[in-house]
Amino acid sequence: MSCVGKLPIIIPEGVKVGLNDLEVKISGPKGELSKSFKGSIGISLAENKLLVKPLSSSKSARAMWGTARSIISNMVTGVKEGFKLKLEINGVGYRAMMKGKYLNLMLAKSHNTKIEIPSHIKVEVPKQNIIILEGTDKEKLGQFASIIIKQRPPEPYKGKGIKFEDQFIPCKEGKKN
């Protein structure tokens, strides 16, 4: 029995859910999301609750049970409230700025890095070293954040690079003579 999968997903006011065979469509004040699931998961709507159940007792169906429930729960939260990620840039001369629909990063390379911002993600740069990402889809928001971090991941000796705001980077000790 899945500890996560057996919990019902409560649908808040202002959020509409549509079920078509293996596809779930959820719409709310912040937007609309849809996701298809394999045939091993059954999704039912009763009153204001969504229930996810495995259709068989196979190992893959049980594994997808809790995962599917978490994905649907994140979709409901996303269309109701949205998700927000803060990235922090550390390093001398490291900066970020917006230029149209591009995020321009200056990260001590021979050239500036331009990253195109997807249409479903809103990006703000309140300071040169802070990037705020907002969106309804938690998965796509995290993927875009990882694309930005990959441009200059935090290094363990001085802590320079791009990281999540609340992320701790353990610093190593330098060479001893």
From Swiss-Prot:
Gene3D superfamilies: Ribosomal protein L6, alpha-beta domain. SUPFAM superfamilies: Ribosomal protein L6. One of its GO terms (cellular component) is ribosome. One of its GO terms (biological process) is cytoplasmic translation. GO terms for molecular function: rRNA binding; structural constituent of ribosome. Part of the 50S ribosomal subunit. This is Large ribosomal subunit protein uL6.
